[in-house]
Amino acid sequence: MAAVEDAVLVAGGIGSRMLPASAVIAKELLPLVDIPAISHLAREAVEAGAKRIHIITSPNKDFSNIAGDNSWASGKRADIAKEILSPFCDVDVFVHVQHVARGFGDALSCALHSIDGPFMVLLGDNILLDTFSGTRNYVASNASKRLVEEYEKTSLPCVGLSAVEDPENYGVVAMNGNLVKEIVEKPNRELAPSNLVLCGRYVFTEDTKDLLSKYSFEEYGELQSIAVQKHWMENNGLIGVELDGFQWYDSGAPIPWLKSQIDYALRREDLQGSIREWLEDRLQR
């Protein structure tokens, strides 16, 4: 069985819900307090075993600074861990441009000519954290590692799942044991098969490229990736990995991102005291 050594960071969307901010800075570069969102994803991928990271971007986005060597900044802030200043420092980086926004499946197609074997996928505006360390003693998320470990046991494609209170806003799954039996896109709440939803983490198998050709964008549109996952469900199987114990932060819209900032700051040991004191004072006014 081939090792999972490639990770695809999907960061091509225009971020319309985050305009006007996303007109000048990619939503994937927005900081969760002081650490860019994409830095969390890069370190998570490395923690899971990635040796090559493929960034799917659009023509108007530039990730060259974050993907480069920022060790020069250590002279200014020696307290910041090297892997946070230069989060891609220990992997090979490939940038692939999706010239026309045609959905998740088409975005993956932009990178697959450079990938042999299974690969991780991380959606660029979704951060999943199970530790809340600061910039001095940063500890990467284990979310993708959990999926890779499941793939290594089964050789089957895997999707990360999170329990939510508003499943009508997501792709919701019906499960049979650890197997995904159905994915329902944004169902009415009363029709949702569960409260488990896709949360932007995947391990896909090496047949993905052929399946994206079989279930083409021209026929399936932006549901192309769902058609591929349905193929796996109906054949050898698609594993659902519940990522309990993780906080899910979303940089794709203002209110969720603001809530993310506050929640994350309240969980960080180096910030929680001062931010809690300020919040308590502010809420009393």
Spans of features found by a protein language model:
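Catalytic-core segments of class I nucleotidyltransferases/pyrophosphorylases
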Residues: 133-140, 144, 148, 179-277
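A structural signal for short hydrophobic beta-strand segments in well-ordered beta-sheet cores
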Residues: 29, 173-175, 240
